[in-house]
Amino acid sequence: MANVHHISVPSKVLFQKARKLVPPMLEKFHKGQQGRVAVIGGSLDYTGAPYFSAMASARLGCDLSHVICESSAATVIKSYSPNLMVHPILPSSASVKDPSSIDAPSLASPIIAMLGRLHALVIGPGLGRDGVTLKVVTEVMKEARSRSIPFVLDADGLLLVTENPDLVKGYKDCILTPNVNEFSRLAKALNIEVPSLAQISSKESGDKTSKEAEACEKLSQALGGVTIIQKGPHDVISNGVTSIVSDLPGGLKRSGGQGDTLTGSLGTLLAWRAAYHDALWDSGEQEHSKEAENKEEVQGELESNKRMSPSTTLLLAAWAGAAITRECSRRAFKAKGRSMQASDLTDEVHESFLTLIGEPEGSKVPERL
């Protein structure tokens, strides 16, 4: 891995450090401080994906989980769970008089008005490819970026980046979660040469990961340091400066919708990350003001009791989200085998969190029976 800035930190150490990002359960907190996350997606054809993503956010532990969707999807998503706040304010061609002539900033204004109340966005689950919808979401992304609101992009949210990489280029508070096909399309759009599946498959296990990490790092660099989770047998995570691999065992069933558990988990982890950097509680770490700028400094923060800088916490949040999702998949597959569905992962989010990360010191939670 000569060209890859890969770090190797034991999973146990990473989970201990990830626990530092988790707000303890304390009487002093009020509603919303432990995370306000919104999923932007949900259309006539796709209602499951935003639900699975928003429920993963809720089950991991955010206080308020929103879905911003097209009106055609709202009632369906509401019927799935009363725990989600569903807002039918995402325009589509069916909801405007003249789809060929729209004022996208004006149509986006109801969504933009919500941004001040949110810690993180998940953009893409069930979004679809309606032209009006994508133009409106583009405006929302621009505004979120201008306000430094972190967001996760998946599915058709990634299509927007493929068509206009400048939307995220250089934005360090963004996580992309492409599968192998989405990764290839992004790489092609940015003229990044990546090894084919056949080339990767012909390599030994360690070399496969090396090739994937190198490609992931190159794509991140081309996007100016955006964090990328390249999903696969091993999840490769890179911000262009530092790369890390999530290789916990997962399930073997490749049913659709499992990536929505990842995006929702990431949404909550990004919200917790914001609370961590706002110092809403004492993490017990030594104060440390220097930003980690290279692989060695990131690894140093992860392996010490120093307070982490934003670049380190973003990489750690991405790794933790991937690890939790893999554990959800493993548990669900063990219970359901070939019949496993995306909803089975939702049921495993909390137990997976407790098994891998656990409640932080000082949390006042009831003892388990």
Swiss-Prot record:
SUPFAM superfamilies attached to this UniProt entry: Ribokinase-like
Start-end of Basic and acidic residues biased regions: 284-306
Descriptive protein name: ATP-dependent (S)-NAD(P)H-hydrate dehydratase
Recorded family membership: Belongs to the NnrD/CARKD family.
Cited NCBIfam families: yjeF_cterm (TIGR00196)
Chief location bin: cytoplasm
EC number: 4.2.1.93
Organism: Emericella nidulans (strain FGSC A4 / ATCC 38163 / CBS 112.46 / NRRL 194 / M139) (Aspergillus nidulans)
